[in-house]
Amino acid sequence: MSGQPKRLMVMAGGTGGHVFPGLAVAHHLMAQGWQVRWLGTADRMEADLVPKHGINIEFIRISGLRGKGVKALLAAPLRIFNAWRQARAIMKRFKPDVVLGMGGYVSGPGGLAAWSLGIPVVLHEQNGIAGLTNKWLAKIATTVMQAFPGAFPNAEVVGNPVRTDVLALPLPQTRLVSRDGPIRVLVVGGSQGARVLNQTLPQVAARLGDAVTIWHQSGKGAQHTVEQAYAEAGQPQHKVTEFIDDMAAAYAWADVVVCRSGALTVSEIAAAGLPAIFVPFQHKDRQQYWNALPLENAGAAKILEQPQFTAEAVADTLAGWSRDTLLTMAERARAVSILDATERVASEVIRVART
């Protein structure tokens, strides 16, 4: 086996926050000659996205258990067992030297299958609070890493793997020091948008007038409604798009970002070196709050939880930040970011792989 390329199976799915960091590590190792195969589910985003990146994907049938009712919970052991058997059969065929769990429902049965076959299991937790699947898998994993401190008490903090075009952006001092004119506000709600952002930011624009210029990513199907809201607020000049294909270019344009605080978003904003107003998605474990807290503690961001996220609060916050303040915050964001997360995760995969 010594002359043959090493084999990695990445287990990740469901959301971009799981899939994109996995892709970053996969590409890094493929450039070193590794063979990579992906384990996912056929009805989530990875089914289309991963093959576009030149990686073969295998599917198992598994879904989440939250909010499914008593019947689904009673059936869960059988479903998990079947998914475990499917994952085990796939791994017997591919024979990975190591598996990398990046989150999503697929990681549970996939990690158990690898463990049962004696394959090393590397886990990476993207969020500030560990998900249920990773909490279980951490007990059997060879190595556990985390993006933010606090998800696991003794795991190494390695950051989140971030896209190379974001890492390649000029430093905040280079981008921002000579800017003048209206503050450039980038509003990002994710691919599905965020209703609270779509409803609130047109009112913020009305309060701030010519002091800001806004680029607002509304999410699928919301562009016309949000454009109309800006027009009705007397602020039709602001740019609204459903999606932003080139996030690095958007970050380069912005002076400040207003957004949810998903793990990958927070990590990208820190790596780009941008101040932010975060409005965490309201979830019972406050996962997005804990993702954003390190940047707020560093003086690089402000968290406004959804009940406090009013047009008045956002407008007052933006109006209170001078260009010098924004530059200082941007430099603090960049200073706390972990820029070599991809290399750190990949190095651990290499270290624990079967010889």
Curated annotation (Swiss-Prot):
<feature type="binding site">
    <location>
        <position position="244"/>
    </location>
    <ligand>
        <name>UDP-N-acetyl-alpha-D-glucosamine</name>
    </ligand>
</feature>
<keyword id="KW-0997">Cell inner membrane</keyword>
<feature type="binding site">
    <location>
        <position position="191"/>
    </location>
    <ligand>
        <name>UDP-N-acetyl-alpha-D-glucosamine</name>
    </ligand>
</feature>
<dbReference type="GO" id="GO:0051991">
    <property type="term" value="F:UDP-N-acetyl-D-glucosamine:N-acetylmuramoyl-L-alanyl-D-glutamyl-meso-2,6-diaminopimelyl-D-alanyl-D-alanine-diphosphoundecaprenol 4-beta-N-acetylglucosaminlytransferase activity"/>
</dbReference>
<feature type="binding site">
    <location>
        <position position="288"/>
    </location>
    <ligand>
        <name>UDP-N-acetyl-alpha-D-glucosamine</name>
    </ligand>
</feature>
<keyword id="KW-0131">Cell cycle</keyword>
<keyword id="KW-0573">Peptidoglycan synthesis</keyword>
<keyword id="KW-0808">Transferase</keyword>
<dbReference type="GO" id="GO:0050511">
    <property type="term" value="F:undecaprenyldiphospho-muramoylpentapeptide beta-N-acetylglucosaminyltransferase activity"/>
</dbReference>
<dbReference type="GO" id="GO:0030259">
    <property type="term" value="P:lipid glycosylation"/>
</dbReference>
<protein>
    <recommendedName>
        <fullName>UDP-N-acetylglucosamine--N-acetylmuramyl-(pentapeptide) pyrophosphoryl-undecaprenol N-acetylglucosamine transferase</fullName>
        <ecNumber>2.4.1.227</ecNumber>
    </recommendedName>
</protein>
<feature type="binding site">
    <location>
        <begin position="15"/>
        <end position="17"/>
    </location>
    <ligand>
        <name>UDP-N-acetyl-alpha-D-glucosamine</name>
    </ligand>
</feature>
<keyword id="KW-0472">Membrane</keyword>
<dbReference type="GO" id="GO:0008360">
    <property type="term" value="P:regulation of cell shape"/>
</dbReference>
<dbReference type="InterPro" id="IPR006009">
    <property type="entry name" value="GlcNAc_MurG"/>
</dbReference>
<keyword id="KW-0132">Cell division</keyword>
<feature type="binding site">
    <location>
        <position position="163"/>
    </location>
    <ligand>
        <name>UDP-N-acetyl-alpha-D-glucosamine</name>
    </ligand>
</feature>
<dbReference type="GO" id="GO:0051301">
    <property type="term" value="P:cell division"/>
</dbReference>
<dbReference type="Pfam" id="PF03033">
    <property type="entry name" value="Glyco_transf_28"/>
</dbReference>
<keyword id="KW-1003">Cell membrane</keyword>
<keyword id="KW-0328">Glycosyltransferase</keyword>
<comment type="similarity">
    <text>Belongs to the glycosyltransferase 28 family. MurG subfamily.</text>
</comment>
<feature type="binding site">
    <location>
        <begin position="263"/>
        <end position="268"/>
    </location>
    <ligand>
        <name>UDP-N-acetyl-alpha-D-glucosamine</name>
    </ligand>
</feature>
<dbReference type="InterPro" id="IPR004276">
    <property type="entry name" value="GlycoTrans_28_N"/>
</dbReference>
<keyword id="KW-0961">Cell wall biogenesis/degradation</keyword>
<comment type="pathway">
    <text>Cell wall biogenesis; peptidoglycan biosynthesis.</text>
</comment>
<dbReference type="GO" id="GO:0005975">
    <property type="term" value="P:carbohydrate metabolic process"/>
</dbReference>
<dbReference type="InterPro" id="IPR007235">
    <property type="entry name" value="Glyco_trans_28_C"/>
</dbReference>
<comment type="function">
    <text>Cell wall formation. Catalyzes the transfer of a GlcNAc subunit on undecaprenyl-pyrophosphoryl-MurNAc-pentapeptide (lipid intermediate I) to form undecaprenyl-pyrophosphoryl-MurNAc-(pentapeptide)GlcNAc (lipid intermediate II).</text>
</comment>
<keyword id="KW-0133">Cell shape</keyword>
<dbReference type="GO" id="GO:0009252">
    <property type="term" value="P:peptidoglycan biosynthetic process"/>
</dbReference>
<feature type="binding site">
    <location>
        <position position="127"/>
    </location>
    <ligand>
        <name>UDP-N-acetyl-alpha-D-glucosamine</name>
    </ligand>
</feature>
<dbReference type="Pfam" id="PF04101">
    <property type="entry name" value="Glyco_tran_28_C"/>
</dbReference>
<dbReference type="GO" id="GO:0071555">
    <property type="term" value="P:cell wall organization"/>
</dbReference>
<dbReference type="GO" id="GO:0005886">
    <property type="term" value="C:plasma membrane"/>
</dbReference>
